[in-house]
Amino acid sequence: MLAYCLFSAKVVFLPQTNRIIMALPIDFITRTRALLGEEFDHLEAALSADVPVSIRINPMKGTPAPKAGAPVAWCESGFYLPERLSFTFDPLFHAGAYYVQEASSMFLEQAIKAYVKEPVRCLDLCAAPGGKSTHLASLLPDGSLLVSNEVIRSRSYVLAENIAKWGHPDTIVINNDPEEIGEALPHLFDVIVTDVPCSGEGMFRKDTDSTGEWSVDNVRLCASRGRRIIHDIWNALKPGGILIYSTCTYNTEEDEENIHYI
């Protein structure tokens, strides 16, 4: 049984099939090389390397650390696996004993540990499928309230399922536009996490099809959407509260320029 294999000394993995050949969009290469200079070659090599597989275990369920896993340096419950398992056949996966998540997304833990020291009301604004929400549920101090929102209804069902499997009762799942939340819940949240929809440059290695969806126009659209989301939700943040802004992309329009906007 894979549940046994993952968390015991004998680990059985699928063959390595996650090395890809990357064909990057020309405009992306031109823009990113201008931004990174000589370091672009390192990025290009990294995007064609094996896709690391990482999981975050659920401390509430007493899940042991995988004996074949290397720890993620910035996440106490995060581990890299040597190769990818067929998680859909693992009952522990369906029971919420662990969550499959890219290690970079687990860096949220450092922000929470640095700035959240007492119970808070926290909003995960763009929460589906639930990686950051399940992480927040494990990290926030006892007595906190977590509200996980997903504006796309079909994705909100997936979010609700993952939250239920994770097993924290102090989490509410909602399906609202940021503007609705900002108007209805003024100054309610101590912490708002905004992992905003983006052009997905950070997804190139994981999903080769995403390169075909990338364009300069989409970068501009996503940058504008990110600012709209921040504008609409700002009223829900308490004065002096914490806003965590993140994307899975590299360009300055969606990252640094939107930070300047904030």
Residue ranges and their predicted role:
Residues 1-262:
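S-adenosylmethionine
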